[in-house]
Structure formats: structure tokens, C-alpha cells
């Protein structure tokens, strides 16, 4: 579906480009931002998109979030993360791989579902952290990651992961008020855990 009077195109890197009468003329008193966003009449959206056979377009990820592995492969984190998060046992997944030789992930379990599973397995625990450290829970999440990996290409597969010992929290700056992950902040806060995945 294309809006009347609009043209769409994909740049070589997959960025969605748009032009037409309803595209804005630029940022008010911000010529540099305008120059970076509007080039040769095309609005550079900052979104990576995919065009389908029926000419419809799907937004895949933000261009700024694209990772480039040590091997030079461009990867879209949200594709990998959504595959992992399709598990009911996994609440959040943050993949790491920019400049790295393989993909790893920080995973937050779904407390309610994993705790119900643990009770059904007759496993006793006291805290969220205690639950994430249990061998049975780690094995459960490994099986879920392995299942999700089957739908990913070799370079996208999550090779190692770390279970977060606490739930991501807005007050700690890990997520926004609307619960969107703050990737750069999390990478700083969990640097030790990330580095341990690559040892």
C-alpha cells in the first residue's frame, strides 16, 4: 500500500527512503540535521525496511541499531531478539555482536512463567536471582534458545547467553518509560557479563 503522491525506495543498506509533496521541508533552524535527513529530495527515514513481492514494506529495525560482526556481516538485532523472545519463558533479549566474532545475548526470564514451571518441577527458590542461577532453569532457557536458533542463519545464531539476575527496570535506566530497551545503557551496565561471554 503506497500513499498517493508518495514514492518509496530502499537504499543499498536497506534504509527506507521517501519523497513526495507531504514530506517535510526540513528542521526549523537546524540546517545540519536537515542536510543529514533530506538528500536529493529523499527523506532518509533511519528505518531499515524490507519490500515484499506485493510491493508492501515492513520496517525491520532502526538503522542505528544494525550490528556489524567482526566478520563484516550486517545483522538486524530485532530479528534475532524477536525469535528468542517467541519463547514464553523469555521476557526480554538483548543481543550483542557489534564488532564481535559471534552473537551472544543477555536474557531476562519471564518471572511468572518460569516460576510456575519451577514449581511444577518441584524446584524451590527464594528470589529472582536465585531462580536464574538454577541449573534446571539455565538448561530450560538453553533449549529455548536452541529452538529459536533453528529459524536463524548461522551468523545470526546466539552462541552464548547470560541470564540477567534482575528484571530490567526503568529506575535503573535500563528501559524507557514505555519499557523499550536502552541497548547502549544496558551494554554499559552489563559490560562484565558481556565480556565474560567472549572469554
Question: Which residues make up each language-model segment?
Answer:
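Conserved C-terminal "lid"/linker of ANL adenylate-forming enzymes
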Residues: 67, 92-94, 142, 146-199
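C-terminal boundary motif of the adenylate-forming
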Residues: 48, 87-113
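Conserved ATP-binding/catalytic segment of the ANL
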Residues: 2, 6-69
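Adenylate-forming
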Residues: 23, 37-38, 56-85, 114-134, ...
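Beta-sheet entry/capping signal
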Residues: 15-16, 56-57, 66, 91-94, ...
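Generic, well-ordered alpha-helical scaffold segments in large soluble proteins
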Residues: 30, 37, 48, 83, ...
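Conserved adenylate-forming
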Residues: 1-13, 21, 101-102, 109-121, ...
Amino acid at each position: 500500500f503506497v500513499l498517493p503522491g508518495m514514492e518509496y525506495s530502499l537504499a543499498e543498506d536497506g534504509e527506507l527512503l521517501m519523497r513526495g509533496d507531504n514530506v517535510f521541508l526540513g528542521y526549523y533552524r537546524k540546517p545540519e540535521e536537515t542536510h543529514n535527513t533530506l538528500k536529493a529530495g529523499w527523506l532518509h527515514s533511519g528505518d531499515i525496511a524490507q519490500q515484499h513481492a506485493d510491493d508492501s514494506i515492513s520496517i525491520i529495525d532502526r538503522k542505528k541499531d544494525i550490528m556489524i560482526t567482526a566478520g563484516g556481516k550486517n545483522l538486524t538485532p530485532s530479528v534475532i531478539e524477536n525469535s528468542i523472545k517467541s519463547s514464553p519463558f523469555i521476557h526480554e533479549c538483548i543481543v550483542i555482536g557489534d564488532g564481535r566474532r559471534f552473537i551472544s545475548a543477555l536474557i531476562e526470564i519471564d518471572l511468572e512463567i518460569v516460576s510456575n514451571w519451577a514449581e511444577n518441577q518441584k524446584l524451590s527458590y527464594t528470589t529472582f536471582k536465585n531462580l536464574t542461577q538454577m541449573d534446571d532453569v539455565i538448561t530450560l532457557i538453553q533449549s529455548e534458545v536452541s529452538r529459536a536458533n533453528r529459524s536463524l542463519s548461522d551468523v545470526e545464531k546466539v552462541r552464548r547467553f547470560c541470564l540477567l539476575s534482575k528484571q530490567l527496570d526503568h529506575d535503573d535506566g535500563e528501559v524507557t518509560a514505555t519499557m523499550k530497551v536502552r541497548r547502549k545503557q544496558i551494554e554499559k551496565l552489563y559490560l562484565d557479563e558481556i565480556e565474560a561471554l567472549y572469554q
